[in-house]
Amino acid sequence: MKKIIAACLITIAFSCENKAQTPKAQEAIINAKPVEVPIKNGKAKAYFASGCFWCVEAIYESVKGVDEVISGYSGGHTQNPTYKASNTGKTGHAEAVEVIYDPNIVSFETLVEVYFGSQNPTQVNGQGNDRGSQYRSIIFYQNDEQKQIILKKKDALAKKLNASIAAEVYPFQKFWRAEDYHQNYERLHPNNSYIQNVSIPRLNRFKAKFPDLLKENK
């Protein structure tokens, strides 16, 4: 019996230790020095998490000056996250997008405006019925200039709405591309029920709000 009790105590202690490590690992991500992605062939990259990446990908794809948007994961403390793993809420990662854009056409500041203007900025840990830490709102900065832009926009919105803004502000570390079947999901699956009932309506609300930012025929 003593051996059984001892074994149980060891198991509990090990479990508690693992649970204690997760917040510390996540804290290290939040307090890390940002990684700056260099401009390549005149194109810059920005990173955002705002609920389901299918929705966010389609929104940024419609913006003038944006060349490509890739769905993936970022903001967590584990390596090589997958859709299944991120959905457990234990990786720290959120569904995110990589926005590849021409800074001569659209600025990082405008991309942040698109971000706040295309979501429910006060909803914590999700957008709509997509709920959980994997759907939380995060804006990633690569340098202090970007950080100040984000904080200024966030503060102004909080004052305008007289409410707390849910978006977390993280130093960018790494973006992990999602599985191929997630890429261009809205465009490739227009008849999917989620796309019809959630993604397209969200995109249309954004379009009505920011008509001057849209590409032609979008």
What are these regions (language model features)?
Residues M1-A25:
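Bacterial Sec-dependent N-terminal signal peptides
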